[in-house]
């Protein structure tokens, strides 16, 4: 991650343009519009969530992204939007913030690619206030044996081509195991159940609260 993923950052927004105009527009609106108070977004990527903060109750927004190439694109997007969002280059596993310092933490398609899933979730739990919300949208391990097997088989290739993406992670279980209670759990299937897109299904959408 120190060197980043230059080619992936270069194609990401174009690759996702169709989804951004379709289902992702509604997902991002739901996740981000519900943010309130002091907000931390981990793994901001190219800043696709940024436009949606205008309609939220966020008082301040800090966005982190470890990849320098993704971060550069996020900075350019932020300049175009002219929004008061603070950007920092830092991984989710090592957040440089005080305990219980955020009212909301946001992540969209982040937990598949963090280097240490449990470590990242512990950090999110640490910086979130006791009555705060962790609002997330992630793609996760299939609940069907054949789908999960396919994810396991292609996981090494996905990690190489997809900027460290691991499609076979049971993110929901990891979140619950890190001291959160899932409150609005929804399992979504925006992609058809055919290879290769089926590797990224299902998706989960939720608001989690600290236990």
Residue ranges and their predicted role:
Residues 18-38, 48-52:
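Conserved alpha-helix/loop element of class I SAM-dependent methyltransferases that forms part
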Residues 40-94:
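Class I SAM-dependent methyltransferase SAM/SAH-binding core
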Residues 90-105:
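A short acidic, Gly/Pro-enriched loop at the edge of an enzyme's catalytic core
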Residues 104-116:
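A short SAM/SAH-binding and catalytic strip from SAM-dependent methyltransferases
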Residues 118-133:
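A short glycine-rich, Lys/Arg-flanked "PGG" loop and its adjoining helix->strand segment in the class I
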Residues 135-157, 162:
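Conserved class I S-adenosyl-L-methionine
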Residues 164-179:
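Short alpha-helix
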Residues 186-211:
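Core SAM-dependent methyltransferase catalytic element
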């Amino acid at each position: 991650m120190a060197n980043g993923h230059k080619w992936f950052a270069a194609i990401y927004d174009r690759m996702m343009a169709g989804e951004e105009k379709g289902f992702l527009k509604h997902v991002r609106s739901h996740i981000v519009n519900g943010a309130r108070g002091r907000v931390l977004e981990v793994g901001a990527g190219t800043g696709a969530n940024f436009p949606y903060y205008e309609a939220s109750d966020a008082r301040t927004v800090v966005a982190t992204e470890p990849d320098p190439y993704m971060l550069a694109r996020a900075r350019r997007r932020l300049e175009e939007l002219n929004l008061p969002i603070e950007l920092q280059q830092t991984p989710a596993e090592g957040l440089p913030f005080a305990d219980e310092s955020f009212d909301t933490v946001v992540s969209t398609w982040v937990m598949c690619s963090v280097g240490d899933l449990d470590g990242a979730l512990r950090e999110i739990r640490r910086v979130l206030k006791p009555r705060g919300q962790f609002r997330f949208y992630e793609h996760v391990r299939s609940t069907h044996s054949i789908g999960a097997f396919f994810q396991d088989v292609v996981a090494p290739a996905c990690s190489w081509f997809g900027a460290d993406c691991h499609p076979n992670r049971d993110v929901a279980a990891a979140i619950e195991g890190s001291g959160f209670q899932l409150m609005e759990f929804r399992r979504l299937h925006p992609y058809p159940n055919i290879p290769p897109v089926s590797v990224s299904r299902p998706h989960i959408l939720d608001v989690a609260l600290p236990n």
